Amino acid sequence: MQKLAELYRGKAKTVYTTENPDLLVLEFRNDTSALDGQRIEQFDRKGMVNNKFNHFIMSKLEEAGIPTQMERLLSDNEVLVKKLDMVPVECVIRNRAAGSLVKRLGIEEGLVLNPPLFDLFLKNDEMHDPMVNESYCETFGWVNKQHLARMRELSYQANDVLSKLFDDAGLILVDFKLEFGLFNGEVVLGDEFSPDGSRLWDKNTLDKMDKDRFRQSLGGLIEAYEEVARRIGVKLD
């Protein structure tokens, strides 16, 4: 599938149109950002790792009955996907306390959350992705009640699938974000799932194996990403 014009350039991916109006090419770049894009660095192999990682995870979710935008892997850093009408709200599932939740509530990092929390955030870097709720979504017309309920259902379903996948690999799925869109009126999982948008800890050492290594200047970012990929069975080379 030939990519044509650049449609959108995000913090770590570039989206291209194709000759098929229903399909897009996602190009995963080596860029890594923090602080809503204020800090950006490049890491060799990162685009390739995240692309293959994302393709692997999306394939697992498809097998579990979760509709995704994934079509097929095109190259080391490109994938073909369905063109979705994206919902401007991201879903976050939290299995343990970390990140903004710890700061907001003053609770201990790593606290087990049972049942897992479901949060919603408006996708807006300038406003630092403010937290919203279902009432905001309905009032401002970001997504209707039925589609939001489906997004919630699919988020928890994905959590069940992925928590087991990572647990079997000696990892804790602490939290993660998902983005959804509509394709022919149906809610479909879009964007990506990678260590960029999730928190993954080693089950024995509690070492952070995700983008917190970049946010907190811990070093070893790509080594951690590749180790997670290796453990769950992603073929990188």
From Swiss-Prot:
Its Enzyme Commission number?
6.3.2.6
GO BP annotations listed: 'de novo' IMP biosynthetic process; cobalamin biosynthetic process
Gene3D superfamilies xrefs: ATP-grasp fold, B domain, Phosphorylase Kinase, domain 1
- What is the catalytic activity of this protein? 5-amino-1-(5-phospho-D-ribosyl)imidazole-4-carboxylate + L-aspartate + ATP = (2S)-2-[5-amino-1-(5-phospho-beta-D-ribosyl)imidazole-4-carboxamido]succinate + ADP + phosphate + 2 H(+)
Q: Name one GO cellular component term.
A: cytosol
Q: Sorted alphabetically, which keywords does the UniProt record give?
A: ATP-binding, Ligase, Nucleotide-binding, Purine biosynthesis
State which pathway it belongs to.
Answer: Purine metabolism; IMP biosynthesis via de novo pathway; 5-amino-1-(5-phospho-D-ribosyl)imidazole-4-carboxamide from 5-amino-1-(5-phospho-D-ribosyl)imidazole-4-carboxylate: step 1/2
GO terms, molecular function: ATP binding; phosphoribosylaminoimidazolesuccinocarboxamide synthase activity
Name the enzyme group at the top EC level.
ligase
The record's InterPro entries line, in alphabetical order, gives: SAICAR_synt/ADE2_N, SAICAR_synt_PurC, SAICAR_synth, SAICAR_synthetase, SAICAR_synthetase_CS
Family of the protein in this entry: Belongs to the SAICAR synthetase family.
**HAMAP family, from UniProt?**
SAICAR_synth
Q: What is this protein called?
A: Phosphoribosylaminoimidazole-succinocarboxamide synthase
The uppermost taxa in this organism's lineage are: Bacteria, Pseudomonadati, Pseudomonadota, Gammaproteobacteria, Enterobacterales
